[in-house]
Every structure is written in C-alpha cells, then in structure tokens.
C-alpha cells in the first residue's frame, strides 16, 4: 500500500534522467544564487571522505538511531517509515550543505514521501546531487538544476568536479546493480526516460472528451519508426498535419520535456478536425475512426506534396510509385482467392490494408424468464388453487381511497390469505357464484366478479380495486358497475419503460359499461384484462372478438379452455361462456347502450342480428366460424354482425343509442334491433359471406393466440381498462362465443386448428397480446428487451486474437445470392452454344443438298425463315434465352438434352457476294456465298457478344500476402443494429506479447523474415457506450534495450496513460485489459 501511494504521488512530479548536453542547455538559462552562499566545498569533501560506502543515512539510522540524536526519530517517522521498504528502488542523493546521504527519486527529487524531501523539510537544506548521475544537481528553493561549471579566466570549470570524483570512488556498485534490477522491474513513472533517444511517456491534455484522440496518439508517439522519421527527417516543407505531428514528437522527446508532466496536442487535434469535421465539438467518438482518418490524412497530404513538388520515382511508362511514410509503416497486403467448386477455376485479388479489423465471436444472451409465466406454469401444472377456493376479497370499487396495489411500493409481493398453500404471484380466482340476483329490472342477470384495470404507459400505472360480491349487489342500482381484474405481480426490473410505480385507485366510469373478458379453465378463473384502442405494427391489422350474451334463469359459467396455457398442447372441447347482460354486450369493440325499442343500423349490404333478454325464455345465436377462410358461403347460423369499417373507430365501433332513436346506416344496409321483453323473441340471420372483400384481413379485435415460444420469449401482460380491445395480427380470425339456456357448442378444436393451419403457428395457443411490446403507450408492457446484450462466444474455446485471425482466414462458402460469377463456366457455356449452333447448321445444310452435290443458295435463302423450326424439330427442344446457371458446364451433351441451353433466334447470314451459275434456259441465280468463313465469323461474333453470366458456388479464402512493419489489429467490439442503435461487446479477448503470423500468411509469399511481432501498445475502452473512456498502455524504455531484450518475456517497461495521468503498469495488467486496438512492431 505504501508503494502504491508512492507511485501515485509520482504522477504529479517531474523526475527524469537528464543527459549532459541537455542539462548544460537548461542551466545556462537558470543560475542559482544559493550555491555560492550555502556550499562549503572543503567541508563537504572531508565529510565525503569519511564515508566508506554510499548508503541512505535515514535507512541506516532506522536501526541504529538514538532518541537523543540530532533530529530525533520521532520527528522523522511521519515521512521515512513509508519509504524504507522502497529505498533499494531509489537513487541516492548527497546533500551539498551537510554531506548527508539520503535516498530519493530516480529522476528529480520531488516525491513528497522520499527521504531526500524529508531531509529538506527538516534541515532546510536546499542543494543536493545524485550519486548515480552527478549531472542531476537540484536546488529545492529555485526548483531548477544547478550549473555544471563556472567560467573562470575564459575557461569553464566544474565546481563540483572533486566531489564527483569522490562519489565515484565510494563503491558505486554497492547500490547501482540493485538499483538497475529493481528499477527495470518496478516500472517507475518516468522509467522510460533513460537516454537521449529513449521515449519519454508524457500525459496529453484532454481538450474536451478527446480521450479517443489521446489514447491513439500515445501509441503512435511510442512507435520507433515514426519517431525516427519525424525527429530526423527535414520536414520544413510539409502540410499542417505533418508539421503539427512533428512538433508533438519533438515535445514528447525526453530531451525536450524534462520539466513537463503533460503535453497539449491542441495544434494536431485542430488540424485533424479541419480535415475531418465530425470530430469537432465536445462529443465522444470512436478511436479507430480517428486513427483511420489521421493516417489517411497524412498519406494524402504527403502524396499531394509530392505532386506539387514534381517528385517522381518512376518513369512515365511505369505505374509504380514510391509508397508514402504511412504506407511503408502500416501498409500491408492481403490476398483474396475465390475458386469455383464446379470447374476449379480460381481468381486471386490483392488488396492493401492499414489494419486488420477482426470480428469477435459473440452470441446473444438468452432472454430472461419472466416471473409471471414461470409461476403461472407451476400453478397450472400443480393445481395450486383448489376448486373450492374462495374469491379474493377486496374493498368495494365505490371506495375511492381503497386500492389493491398491483406493484407494491416496497417491491415485495403482497400476501393474499385466500389462496392455497402453493401461493404464486399470479392470482387465480375460482368458483364464481352461479347465481347473482340483480336489483336491476332490465335483464341484468349476473355481475362479473371483477377485473383490475391497470393502464400502463411508460411512467403511468394505475390500478382498480376488486369489489366484493355483496358490495357489488349494493352498488347495482347505479348505472355503471366498476370492474376490476387480475393482479399480476411482475418483476419491476424487467418492465420496460416503467421506472416508477405508483398505487392509485379508480372508480366506476360514468356513461360506459365496463366489462372484461373472463377465462375459466377447470373451475379456475383467469381474468384477462384488455382494452380496445391498441395498435400494433402495420402488419397486425386483423382482429377478432369474443362476445357473450346472457339469459336470466340458469346463467352458465363462461370459460376458455386454458389447460394448455403452458402445459401439454391439449385443447378441450365444448367451452361454456359466461352470459352477459344486454348492457354488457360488446361486439368487436362495439358498445351499445340501448334500452327497449332501440335500433342500430348495420353496414352496407348487411343484415341484422337481434338480442333478446327475457325472464322466461332465451334463445342464443352463435357463429359457426369454422369456415372463416373457406369459400365465401353464406352461413346458415345466425350471429351478430359487427359494423363495416367506415362506421367503426380504429379499435371498433361505438354506437350510443337512446330510446326511440335510430342510427342511420349506409346505402342498402339493414339494421340490428335489440328488444327486451318477457314473452317474445325475434332472431335475425346475418349473411356474413361478403363482409370482407379480402378474407385474410380482419379488423375485429380479439386476444391473439400466441405460441408457447412467443410467450416464453417476451410474455404478455395485458393491462388495460374497460371497453378496451386488443388488435390481432395479420391473417388471424376471431372468436364469437355465446352461451345461454339452449346452448349449442362450437367445435373448439376445429376452430383453433383452422386458425393455426392458416397461420402456421404452434398448436398450443395462449390467448394474449403479441410477445413484443411495440405499443407500450396502448397499455402493454414487454418484460424482455428488443436489444439483448451480446457476450463473447466462449462455447468452443476462449476468445483470443489467434482465434479471431483463424476465423478471419478460414474458408467461406459463397452460394445462393452470394454465388460467384465464374468466367470459366461462362466461357464454356458460350462454346457449348457455338458448337450446338454449328452442329445444327451442318445437319440442315446436308438435308438440302441437291442431286448434283451442289447446295442451292436460293433455296437456303428462301427457307431461312424455317431453319429455326427445323432445328427445334431435329434436336427436340425449343430455343431459350441464356441461362445464368447450369448444373454442370462440363457435360455439354447432357445439358443440351435436358434443355438447359438454347440459341436465340438464329438468323441466316447475309449474302455479301454470290457467283453466277448458269442453269437451264440461260438464267443465273445466286449461289453460296463466296466466303463461307466470313459468314461463319459473323455468326460466331453474334454468339460471343451474348452476355452470359454463370454463377457457381465457390470457396473464398483470405490470407496475408505482405506483413507490415507495424501490425494494427482492430477488434470489432462496437456494432450497430437495423434501428441504428450502437452496442458494445464487452469481455476479455486473450492476446499475448508476441504473435507469429506464419500460419496466416499466403504460401506463395516470398518474404524471408519471419512475421513475428511484439506488442508495442494498445487502446482500451472502459465503461459503456454512453459513459465510456479510452485509455492506453504503452511500452517504453530505451530502444536499444528493447531490441536486445526481445527474447525475454518480462523485460518491457509498461505505462498506463489516461489523458494527462501516467503511471507504471506491469505486463500482467496489460495482458488482462480489454483491448480494442492493438499495435504490434515487427522484430
């Protein structure tokens, strides 16, 4: 811990080894007045001679000091105790005023916790000299180096020459050997500054979110080839980028940055921004993009300068040009070979590269299992809620202050004592009372136990209470009945867009009948809340609905067969549905508040359907929807017709009617009447065959059947209010079930099979909204996220740079849309067509030869229009246009027989010159062309001019043909999806200090030197996309030492640079980092 604190203090100090020439330059500018005043050379020489060895006096007195000594141990323990263990790592300094040896920094003695600083604080002695490097002579008061010599009689003489000789005689090996070893391994903060040609690691000032720029520049400044070029070459005539980069290299050199902790790269950054304006401002950018823009700018600038100066390294007839500096340092070449799998023809292309961008193997995280679905599955499997269990009690809905919190504020599930022992978050209600007498006189026979309306927008969540049975009876005199539903507890961390969850209460909504769908499975009631104005994507336009009609005498329990919710795909037959009162009827989101003698007009060309609620007798109409997608036949069974699309709103239509009031319909439309009477019934039959012009699109709402895989992926949570409708997906049907005394059941199995046969979905439907919450504003909340984070794919082996290179250079099969245009196969197809053409031409000419052995050119010209048909008859195939893909271009004859090839409208060649042949009667006719070769060549050219493209499956392989001096490897950690969202692939990718590219090189490569590289630096990105930071690791030290220690794995000195902060780092720390860009130098 003490050593870590010492290292951290060094980050803000200026300690460095200075060469003799530069120290002279610095001391000429600064003269110290304290040397002549406080240094007594004779006294100092005597003290130095009295010491036999050079050791730190404080470290030695740690063992032998007495309490009554000159400064007292108690006064020194606050500063020397933390540095005793590191004395062997530090240099020894001699106080020029008292001759006392103390240990301190390797560079300048400015570390606060060092013994030399403690000696200065206690004694106020100002002047010290370093024993290992006597050129370092420091004055604490002036904060500068002392002059080496003084001019006397026109000659320069070193005033401390005798002192330096005595110091070198005092057993210098006693400390220098151990110091060299410890210093090389410890990685002091300025250990890289060892000689005039060594690289001095300095921090770079952050100009405002420019860490992406600083991290790249730290690595470029550490590259030996670039530094030698910019420091030694004469670049007086250059562009702004080259000039500013040269100045930055000069400032970072150890000879020019002794007294500077950091460098301001303002000029270079502004030069880059002038050519790449996207880096302006104070926003974060990609460091790899900055690197490419900088290197391209330097290369373009150098090429432009060559053209202006007229520099040419080649003749006019040669296209060779001397590569630029960037091309010679970073430029490499890859070979891309594509070979046809059919004929073996291959093509090789050489492409230059500045860096290798390697894709990192990754995989998507599996979606989190949602708590509500897993618990519901357990309930349905184990039957946790018994048949005789009571309904969960709640306060009346009329009490506005009472709430049943859907999401408790303490993030814990509220206990419900009415449920069974195997209690879950999903509350299942059972045993709804068969009879619920009503005080309302207009046929309302049963009140729904209740449903919770929870409308969830991004930050808005409300909940409605569940009314008790007797409290509901007490409130039935009102025109409206409050509705409530299930309370589903979902992990708040998985709910998207709802960071704050509040409890609220709601009461009955005046002027609207509120009712929710009720589903029952084996005496277990599951309330499924829904709402009507829910819109999904454009492809989800078909809708369906569920309507219920109730009678008075023996109301049935309505339920959906929900046994296959998450279990085996069993579908029960003969569902019974809960009867609803007249005021509670909803058809496709349609809401009719009607009393006796109310009439609602129907859509265009449609019939009507009437509902009758009686105290003595009831006849229930229902819809046979088994043939929904069959031929448009007229249904023989009466059902209730929803209005046309023009009469409904987006979620369904809502017709509010009063007594003796009729809503006019469209042209040619019938009406639907609702009559409430004690003795009479009137049933209308509806022709539903022409309701939809396109039967695959339906706009009637329903709970869309979802497969188990869809539910497990994102799940559903339908939280909506009364009179709300859920839209379904495209091509989906709806269900319209009714129940009453004279109940006629629909074949549920047939109905669901038709749905899934037409949609091609799973056989295990789960009724609910779609799995993705694409309309969270409508009330649906998805538990899973669309952008799941990606992780490194370590299923086969740990991810490493070698594995990425192997993935980059492995064979790739090009097929289907990516099939390769094989020139050899295209040429063979042309030749095949030419041969076939000549073969048919020869057969045709032999057929028309006359008896004298001379062919009749006249007959040939006369019958030229029939040649094509004759060819077709002889060869047995019709002429076809050029085929782009053949199964085998080698087997020519089989291709012809199979009809894969043909020729286009072959025309007879024009007769350019003819010979006069005397015939009977002295007449002459044109004979064969004088030049048959000319005619044939014309036809051959016509065939050759046809553009024939044959695409074949091919194999592609990419290898490195030329290895660059500096290999830059870019790991693709950032990706962008189709929606433009950028994500980061976090995780450690294994890499080594040395890398060999031999197995990734092209076998025809003629390079003699082995492509072995050593790590020179890297760029690492920390954090996430929104709040990230770039840092860099740089290999420092003397160039000659680095070159001589290439075979030693731990001989490097590494530094960690984060903008202006620079600290030493070990090689183990470097290899543990999550590298983004790697820089390797060839050895």
UniProtKB/Swiss-Prot annotation:
GO terms for biological process: protein deubiquitination; proteolysis. A zinc finger (UBP-type) spans 30-165. Zn(2+) 1 binds at residues 32, 34, 139, 142. Residues 202-1083 form the USP domain. The active site is at residues 211, 1029. Residues 409-419, 455-473 have a biased composition (Basic and acidic residues). Residues 387-424, 450-486 are annotated as: Disordered. This is Ubiquitin carboxyl-terminal hydrolase 1. It comes from Arabidopsis thaliana. The gene is UBP1.
């Amino acid at each position: 811990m003490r050593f870590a604190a010492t290292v951290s203090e060094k980050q803000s100090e200026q300690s460095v080894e200075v060469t003799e020439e530069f120290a002279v330059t610095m001391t000429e500018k600064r003269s110290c007045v304290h040397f002549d005043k406080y240094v007594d050379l004779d006294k100092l020489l005597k003290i130095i001679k009295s010491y036999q060895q050079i050791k730190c006096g404080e470290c030695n007195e740690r063992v032998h000091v007495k309490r009554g000594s000159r400064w007292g141990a108690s006064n020194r323990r606050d500063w020397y105790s933390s540095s005793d263990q590191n004395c062997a790592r530090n240099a020894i300094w001699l106080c020029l005023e008292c001759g006392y040896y103390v240990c301190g920094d390797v560079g300048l003695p400015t570390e606060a916790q060092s013994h030399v600083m403690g000696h200065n604080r206690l004694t106020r002695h100002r002047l010290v000299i370093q024993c290992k490097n006597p050129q370092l002579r420091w004055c604490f008061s002036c904060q500068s180096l002392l002059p080496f010599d003084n001019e006397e009689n026109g000659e320069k003489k070193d005033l401390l020459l005798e002192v330096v000789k005595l110091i070198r005689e005092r057993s210098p090996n006693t400390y220098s050997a151990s110091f060299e070893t410890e210093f090389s391994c410890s990685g002091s903060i300025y250990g890289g500054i060892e000689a005039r040609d060594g690289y001095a690691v300095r921090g770079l000032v952050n100009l405002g979110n420019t860490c992406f720029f600083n991290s790249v520049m730290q690595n470029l400044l550490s590259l030996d080839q670039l530094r030698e070029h910019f420091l030694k070459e004469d670049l007086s005539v250059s562009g702004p980028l080259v000039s500013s980069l040269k100045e930055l290299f000069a400032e970072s050199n150890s000879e020019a940055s002794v007294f500077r902790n950091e460098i301001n790269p303002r000029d270079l950054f502004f030069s880059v921004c002038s050519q790449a304006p996207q880096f302006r401002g104070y926003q974060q950018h990609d460091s790899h993009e900055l690197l490419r823009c900088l290197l391209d700018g330097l290369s373009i600038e150098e090429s432009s300068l060559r053209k202006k100066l007229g520099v040419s390294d080649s003749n006019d007839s040669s296209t060779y040009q001397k590569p630029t500096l960037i091309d010679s340092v970073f430029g490499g070449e890859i070979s891309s070979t594509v070979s046809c799998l059919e004929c073996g023809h291959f093509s090789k292309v050489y492409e230059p590269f500045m860096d290798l961008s390697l894709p990192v193997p990754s995989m998507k995280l599996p979606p989190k299992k949602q708590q509500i679905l897993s618990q519901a599955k357990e309930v349905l499997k184990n039957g946790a809620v018994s048949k005789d269990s009571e309904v969960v009690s709640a306060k009346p809905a009329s009490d506005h202050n009472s709430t049943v919190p859907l999401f408790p504020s303490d993030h814990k599930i509220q206990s419900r004592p009415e449920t069974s022992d195997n209690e879950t978050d999903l509350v299942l209600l059972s045993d709804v009372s068969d009879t619920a007498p009503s005080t309302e006189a207009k046929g309302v026979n049963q009140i729904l136990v209740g449903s919770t309306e929870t409308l969830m927008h991004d930050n808005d969540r409300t909940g409605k209470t569940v009314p008790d049975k007797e409290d509901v009876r007490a409130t039935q005199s009102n025109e409206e009945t409050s509705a409530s539903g299930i309370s589903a507890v979902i992990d708040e961390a998985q709910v998207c867009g709802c960071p704050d969850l509040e409890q609220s209460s709601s009461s009955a909504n005046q002027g609207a009948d509120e009712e929710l769908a009720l589903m029952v499975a084996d005496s277990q009631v599951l309330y499924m809340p829904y709402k009507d104005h829910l819109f999904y994507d454009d492809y989800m336009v078909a809708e369906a609905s569920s309507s219920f009609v109730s009678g008075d005498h023996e109301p049935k329990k309505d339920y959906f067969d929900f046994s296959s919710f998450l279990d085996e795909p069993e579908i029960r037959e003969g569902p019974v549905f809960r009867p609803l009162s007249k005021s509670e009827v909803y058809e496709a989101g349609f809401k009719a508040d009607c009393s006796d003698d109310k009439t609602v007009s129907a859509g265009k060309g449609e019939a009507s359907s009437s509902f009758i609620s009686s105290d003595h007798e009831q006849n229930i109409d229902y819809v046979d929807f088994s043939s929904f997608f069959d031929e448009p036949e007229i249904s023989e069974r009466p059902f209730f017709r929803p209005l046309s699309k023009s009469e409904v709103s987006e979620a369904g239509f809502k017709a509010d009617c009063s007594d003796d009031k009729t809503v006019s319909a469209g042209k040619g439309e019938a009406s639907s009447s609702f009559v409430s009477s004690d003795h009479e019934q009137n049933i209308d039959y509806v022709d539903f065959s022409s309701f939809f012009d396109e039967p695959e699109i339906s706009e009637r709402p329903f709970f869309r059947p979802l497969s188990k895989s869809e539910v497990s992926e994102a799940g559903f949570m339908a939280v909506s209010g009364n009179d709300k409708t859920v839209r379904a997906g495209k091509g989906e049907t709806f269900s319209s079930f009714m129940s009453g005394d004279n109940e006629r059941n629909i074949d549920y199995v047939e109905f669901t099979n038709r749905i899934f046969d037409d949609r091609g979905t799973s056989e295990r439907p789960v009724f609910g909204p779609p799995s993705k919450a694409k309309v969270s504003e409508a009330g649906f909340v998805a538990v899973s996220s669309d952008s799941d984070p990606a992780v490194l794919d370590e299923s086969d082996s740990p991810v490493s740079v070698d594995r990425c290179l192997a993935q980059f250079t492995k064979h790739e099969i090009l097929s289907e849309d990516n099939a390769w245009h094989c020139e050899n196969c295209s040429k063979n197809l042309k030749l095949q067509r030419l041969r076939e053409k000549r073969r048919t031409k020869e057969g045709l000419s032999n057929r028309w030869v006359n008896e004298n052995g001379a062919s009749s050119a006249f007959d040939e010209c006369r019958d030229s229009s029939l040649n094509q048909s004759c060819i077709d008859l002889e060869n047995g195939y019709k002429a076809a246009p050029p085929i782009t893909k053949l199964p085998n271009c080698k087997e020519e004859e089989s291709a012809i027989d199979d009809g894969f090839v043909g020729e286009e409208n072959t025309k007879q060649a024009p007769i350019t010159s003819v010979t006069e042949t005397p015939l009977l009667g002295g007449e002459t006719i044109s004979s064969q062309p004088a030049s048959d070769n000319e005619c044939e060549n014309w036809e051959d050219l016509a065939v050759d001019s046809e553009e024939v493209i044959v695409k074949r499956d091919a194999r592609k392989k990419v290898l490195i043909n030329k290895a660059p001096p500096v290999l830059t490897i870019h790991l693709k950690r950032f990706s962008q999806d189709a929606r433009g969202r950028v994500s980061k692939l976090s995780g450690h990718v294994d890499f080594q200090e040395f890398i060999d590219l031999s197995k990734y090189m092209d076998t025809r490569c003629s390079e003699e030197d082995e492509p072995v590289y050593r790590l020179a630096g890297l760029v690492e990105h920390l954090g996430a996309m929104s709040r990230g930071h770039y840092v860099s690791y740089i290999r420092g030290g003397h160039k000659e030492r680095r070159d001589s220690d290439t075979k030693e794995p731990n001989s490097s000195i590494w530094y960690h640079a984060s903008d202006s902060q620079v600290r030493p780092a070990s090689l183990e720390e470097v290899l543990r980092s999550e590298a983004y860009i790697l820089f390797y130098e060839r050895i």
